[in-house]
C-alpha cells in the first residue's frame, strides 16, 4: 500500500512539474536559487491569477503577512502579522524563506542585516517573515512586470553606513 501511494505521489509530482513548466512566467521564478517546483506550483495555486492584484500589499494581505499594530489610546502595542489570510500560502512562504536564507547568498545577507542592524534589529522569526513578505514583492514584480531576478537589487535594501560607501 505504501509503495503504491509513493509511486502515485511521484506520478502526480511529475504531472505538476509538467504543468508548471507550461506556465510562461514560472521559469523565471525557478531561476531564483532556493525556489523549486513545489514552491512555484504552491504559490501559483494559492494566488491564482496575479493580474487581479493591484499591488504586492494585496498579496501580502492574502497571505496574512500584513502588519497590524495592537494599540489603544496612548498605549502603543507590538506590531505583528495579521494572520488573517491563507494559512497554506503563509506556511509555504515561510518554508521558502528558510530555504532561501540557507541557500541564497542575497537572502542570507538580507536576513543577517535584519537581525544585526543597529536600529530596530529583528528577531530571527520576524526576519524570516520580513523575507517572506519581500519574496512576495519579488514574485509580484517578476510575474506582473516580466522583469528578471536581479540579485543586486535584492541587496539594495541593506542600508550600509556612510563609511563603507565612501571611495577609498
Task: Explain the meaning of each model-derived region.
Residues 1-168:
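A detector of single, family-specific signature residues
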